Amino acid sequence: MKEEAFLRRRFSLCPPSSTPQKVDPRKLTRNLLLSGDNELYPLSPGKDMEPNGPSLPRDEGPPTPSSATKVPPAEYRLCNGSDKECVSPTARVTKKETLKAQKENYRQEKKRATRQLLSALTDPSVVIMADSLKIRGTLKSWTKLWCVLKPGVLLIYKTPKVGQWVGTVLLHCCELIERPSKKDGFCFKLFHPLDQSVWAVKGPKGESVGSITQPLPSSYLIFRAASESDGRCWLDALELALRCSSLLRLGTCKPGRDGEPGTSPDASPSSLCGLPASATVHPDQDLFPLNGSSLENDAFSDKSERENPEESDTETQDHSRKTESGSDQSETPGAPVRRGTTYVEQVQEELGELGEASQVETVSEENKSLMWTLLKQLRPGMDLSRVVLPTFVLEPRSFLNKLSDYYYHADLLSRAAVEEDAYSRMKLVLRWYLSGFYKKPKGIKKPYNPILGETFRCCWFHPQTDSRTFYIAEQVSHHPPVSAFHVSNRKDGFCISGSITAKSRFYGNSLSALLDGKATLTFLNRAEDYTLTMPYAHCKGILYGTMTLELGGKVTIECAKNNFQAQLEFKLKPFFGGSTSINQISGKITSGEEVLASLSGHWDRDVFIKEEGSGSSALFWTPSGEVRRQRLRQHTVPLEEQTELESERLWQHVTRAISKGDQHRATQEKFALEEAQRQRARERQESLMPWKPQLFHLDPITQEWHYRYEDHSPWDPLKDIAQFEQDGILRTLQQEAVARQTTFLGSPGPRHERSGPDQRLRKASDQPSGHSQATESSGSTPESCPELSDEEQDGDFVPGGESPCPRCRKEARRLQALHEAILSIREAQQELHRHLSAMLSSTARAAQAPTPGLLQSPRSWFLLCVFLACQLFINHILK
């Protein structure tokens, strides 16, 4: 009784000054038009209320105890002899003031409940139970994780330090059951009764990406405690937390406006049968934020009934101001998705000086002795790929990272993708190509040789188009060293794929680093492919003279579809040339045999273009101070969230030693990495397990490396929301996927925007650690839902809006099945291509071998005799 009185006092809508009146308990009903309260009101006021209490018009909503105000009999009269009573102006003013007080009290109580929930989630002292449990993953293997049980939620961390968040389980939608097991310990299971997701998208501190663990199921979790006593304690604690889970709905649901019928969770048919309702989803809206700002915004998300237009407009303006003030916190501009990899902006960046100063270096006496020791082992023309270079010539970053220097001006490609003129597109592509060379280290430095299986990923945010360019690279071969990379920005309409084989040659006083390979730039909306090649790096003055690093060679940028080609020649400094003759470049743009323009200048400074028909040259490209300030900001993965073979984490100790000037320690750390690579190679050789890249595959026909998850389909603004990356996999978040995921979280919306039960689809993959959501998903139709109303069954389908009609749902399911079939066929074709060469060779060998005769073996003669005997027996029976 005390608890009921406390809850009634806590969620009451009436102002403290009003006193409830006695009503007949047989004539009570719940007010389902206001979410968050369960106050009881009389069904037929007038008889049980005070004699002088005026009855309210029907459009004013159900009467409340505080609205039954005493009015003198003279202040009301009959309306045209009917049974309805008219409310006097005095009573109407009193009702309006009382309703305002109720709404203000409602907001304060809801805000207080929200703060209590936020405090329970973030306060480390509010813990029901915390201990280590083994959790079974999707691959049937067990992982020991730290579980923290709070009211309504189960927080899972990687370690007891509560720093590496893995996921959050929402207990309000879960059932608990003991699970028999033949293994030691005590096993129990948390599951969703309708096989939907039990995970929250964000953590208690707003984390969008969890720590990397083995994949966990989306609709259930199987736990194992060390002993039966510990397991029983967890069962009791979980049952207690399940009783408290109703408080979590204040944070998980985004209630609609109370002025519209059916927006209350208690009033909706879906909530009455235990199923969540859907809501309209904005593309940039968080799917399930569990941070302070979003929970505070929930306190202002509900609106009471509208008395008049003026009050409605005022409340809407106040609500929008409160929402804006609390929703733009911890929000990166243009963040496309909340479930992708976490990226942080790189603050420091070394660009180097323009001109010859950054390409010349004087070697110290100590380093000269190391160089002489190394040169004694070399012969002219020798390949340097297997030679271990001293660490003082190393640039403190991997070669995979260095290949990303070409995308700091990827906004030029965004402009080229929407350019209608083919010649102008070629010039923009050429300008982007030149923008990747002026960033150079101070002095003559060589990046790290990537370890086999090493990966690097980063992205650049485009503020003009609110998009991101993602860069994924992997070392797919060690001998020869091959680096494969993929760049994608589907929203802006371009992607780049390619591979580079690094080769080096020693020529006595000089050496050259050759970048053998090509890259293919594709404009998705036009299906245009531009093939690009790379110059080589030439270092001279090793034995005598000044050590200088230059770029040389001829490169081409060619588009076969529109027949445009750009040719560039990087010129080495001549023997008697001055400072102006270094880094020279010349080239031309042609269309077939016709020369359209010629270029000249310096690749790290000004480049001029002279078009045919014009008598003067114009500035084509210059890395001026303004251009440098317009560089896109690179975002990389935080070090603690990187995998073991990601570049920055892999080489962190070598980089730290080089930055401190400790060459001895850098050499030791570098040797340890190389020795570990050799050990892994020996283990693979002993186990006869060939190396298989994680993100790229080799086309057996063209012998080119391709990204496994590349998507060349044009961007669809009506369906596609944002492109995101998770674990090196690039995917696209779509409207249907967001609407389905929000449906699982139980977000109620206005009645005319609420989707029916058949629209609730279960996602194929919904992992707590930020595993990417595929746009393809399997369907799941609950059977225990109430039927849709006529209002919900009519109308066209709008993503995130009204419910689709049965015909649209049937067509969507048919298209989904067709799409999945096409994907499976494509995967089978890729697998067939992969083994094509092996099959052809085995077929050739089989053709050369002599084919045995049909009746050369005794077994064949025996079978023939048995067959003839059976035939004779059958003929005898039939006669």
From Swiss-Prot:
Source species, domain of life: Eukaryota
Keywords from the named record: Coiled coil, Endoplasmic reticulum, Lipid transport, Lipid-binding, Membrane, Phosphoprotein, Transmembrane, Transmembrane helix, Transport
Residue numbers binding a 1,2-diacyl-sn-glycero-3-phospho-L-serine: L384, S385, R386, V387, V388, L389, N449, S504
Membrane-related topology note: Single-pass membrane protein
Membrane-spanning parts: 860-878
Biased composition, class Basic and acidic residues, residue ranges: 300-309, 316-325, 750-765
Binding residue positions for a 1,2-diacyl-sn-glycero-3-phospho-(1D-myo-inositol 4-phosphate): 384-389, 446-449, 478-479, 670, 674, 678
A GO biological-process term: cholesterol transport
Residues in coiled coil: 93-123
GO cellular component, one term: endoplasmic reticulum-plasma membrane contact site
GO MF, any single term: phosphatidylserine binding
Modified residues (Phosphoserine): S12, S747
Residue ranges, annotated region (Disordered): 1-73, 254-341, 742-806
Localisation per UniProt entry: Endoplasmic reticulum membrane
Domain PH: 126-243
Record family assignment: Belongs to the OSBP family.
Stated role: Lipid transporter involved in lipid countertransport between the endoplasmic reticulum and the plasma membrane: specifically exchanges phosphatidylserine with phosphatidylinositol 4-phosphate (PI4P), delivering phosphatidylserine to the plasma membrane in exchange for PI4P, which is degraded by the SAC1/SACM1L phosphatase in the endoplasmic reticulum. Binds phosphatidylserine and PI4P in a mutually exclusive manner. May cooperate with NPC1 to mediate the exit of cholesterol from endosomes/lysosomes. Binds 25-hydroxycholesterol and cholesterol.
Protein's name according to its UniProt entry: Oxysterol-binding protein-related protein 5
Organism the protein comes from: Homo sapiens (Human)
Primary gene name: OSBPL5
